[in-house]
């Protein structure tokens, strides 16, 4: 009798949890911990765990108020390729990075993005800590971006700090790295070699004037 009663309680509890998950999915209620890719993940107030990235055409935009964690294993190989090709850095097509227009569908993270690599278009409002930055993903940082290797963004508003390179289409703030590149800049570049729309200079470069049409 007791066993039957416990089984009934367990089944009832399981059905309640399942029903609650279904309601959350239907209502779009924010989740505290969510995983991606998942059709059920749209709004997160807490932590998003992303185990691989969706391609641009398939991305389902997600809004995260909290922390976004990216564990895409492909990011481990980019540092290796970087180190192998470090001697040919002058031949890199870094001027093309970030030249794509921002897509209509983008993730939004209000808080912190911590990842091995990000390959989904993302707007980060806060802190971005990444090993291999944003690859094949036009992204925006409003705040601070830090990487032990390089930062690649479409738009940087704030501070970008890395060891080797910061590359952006549009910059409003400060870039600090061995090499800094920005096509539309309002701010300061500090590094061994710096390039903006007006000039190329070692050590320090700047521009505070609007681009002439």
Regions found by a protein language model. Name each.
Residues 1-23:
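Bacterial Sec-dependent N-terminal signal peptides
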